[in-house]
A protein has these predicted regions:
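Positively charged n-region of N-terminal signal peptides that target proteins for export
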Residues: 1-4
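Active-site neighborhood of phospho(di)ester-bond hydrolases with catalytic His/Asp-centered motifs
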Residues: 146-149, 172-178, 205-213, 295-299, ...
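Extended active-site neighborhood of metal-dependent phosphoesterases/phosphodiesterases
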Residues: 103-132, 187-284, 288, 318-322, ...
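Conserved, compact domain cores that house catalytic/ligand-binding motifs in diverse enzymes
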Residues: 141-219
Length: 390
């Protein structure tokens, strides 16, 4: 009898243990690279798994009303077995709300053509509402955004600055680099800033990420694009919302590639050469040319000139000549950990707004004006800056 009881208890413990240690979505989902007709979803599971996202229109129906279309995390037609999942969905309509749900199914083994699956986890849409996002719309009359940079894992400042900028009313949020001091692990990305961002807004509000010079450092640095712009060709890119075309530059490191601090692992001078070639082409594109406003976002500024480091010289030499010809309205930067506004001159023919590490830029268009208000964590207005349409 005692042996039978012990056997039953062991089986119960084993079953409960398997449930407790089952597949689960541990981070995310969050949005990346939302455009007029596409959006990318990123999320993390605790076990190797296949993943997919379901999409549903915001049409008033219950999420369970019909089977929703599925979009799988794949590479060349094969579903990826991974803990990190990303899916880019195309064919969406501009200025349209969509609900979504992400899933993971554990892969217990994959031998030859035989795959054994475990349990499935998904976002809860039974007791809660599925997250909802809105695609961009270049026909939208106005737009708004919030920009922070140089957070360096000060998680509490994210919430303060987002609230100060009234983030719930903004179309998008932009992270302009150095959200961490270096990249050493996946967990660091989430505990350092992304978990808080997901809790606040990133499930439903577009987040656009610009790499800073500190995300280029650490043993996990080459994994950066697995989490940010994971389905794009590069970490530099362009997108439009309302009357604004945004160019997001990756300004690389701030010191020469040969500096001892980099241990011979960097090649940013050539990387910026390639990026300059791309930049020269996109500023001639129809999307760029038809936009009313042109905003460049890059971590390292080309100003001020005094005591300029190598990275700033590179931005000034390789990017600024192209941007001068492209009639840029303003460039938003960080990196210097202080608030500076450089007015246009003969060398840089557009204003450069350098945002401090503990400030947020609250930006919005209004007719012929592009407003940029800078606030600190206490909500104190640091400076108002307005750019007039050209």
């Amino acid at each position: 009898m005692r042996k039978a009881v012990l056997t039953i208890l062991f089986l119960v413990w084993a079953v409960l243990g398997s449930f407790a240690d089952g597949i689960a979505i541990t981070h995310g989902p969050y949005l990346q690279n939302v455009g007029e007709s596409e959006a990318t979803f990123v999320w993390v599971a605790n076990k190797p798994s296949i993943g997919w996202v379901e999409l549903a229109p915001d049409d008033g129906t219950n999420y369970y009303a019909v089977e929703r279309p599925k979009f799988f995390d794949t590479t060349n037609g094969v579903k990826n077995t991974s803990t990190l999942h990303s899916v880019k969905v195309k064919g969406l309509k501009p200025g349209t709300n969509y609900r979504y749900r992400v899933y993971v199914t554990e892969v217990l083994s994959h031998k030859s053509w035989v795959v054994t699956y475990g349990r499935t986890d998904a976002l809860d849409v039974f007791y809660g509402q599925p997250p909802m996002f809105r695609t961009n719309d270049t026909k939208k009359g106005e737009t708004s955004f919030a920009v922070v940079n140089d957070i360096h894992a000060r998680v509490g400042d994210i919430t303060k600055l987002m609230n100060v900028a009234n983030y719930k009313q903004k179309d998008m949020v932009i992270f302009n680099g150095d959200m961490l001091s270096n990249l050493t692990s996946e967990e660091q990305i989430f505990t350092g800033f992304m978990d808080e961002s997901i809790k606040l807004f990133a499930k439903e509000k577009p987040l656009y990420y610009v790499r800073g010079n500190h995300e280029t450092r650490g043993e996990y640095a080459t994994m950066c694009q697995k989490y940010f712009s994971p389905k794009e060709p590069h970490l530099y890119y362009m997108f439009s919302q309302g009357p604004v075309c945004f160019i997001m530059l990756d300004t690389g490191e701030d010191k020469p590639d040969t500096d001892l601090e980099y241990s011979g692992i960097t090649d940013y001078d050539n990387y910026r050469n390639e990026q300059a070639e791309w930049l020269a082409q996109v500023v001639k594109s129809e999307e760029y040319c038809r936009a009313k406003w042109h905003v460049v976002v890059g971590h390292i500024p080309p100003r001020p000139v005094k005591d300029m480091w190598h990275g700033q010289y590179e931005v000034l030499r390789k990017f600024v000549p192209i941007l001068n010809e492209a009639k840029v309205d303003v460039m938003l930067c960080g990196h210097l950990h202080r608030h500076i506004i450089n007015q246009p001159d003969n060398e840089v023919k557009f204003p450069v707004v350098v945002n401090s590490l503990d400030h947020v830029i609250s930006g919005w268009t209004e007719g012929q004006n592009l407003h940029l208000d800078m606030y600190d964590t206490k909500g104190t207005l640091v400076e108002k800056f307005t750019v007039k349409a050209k």
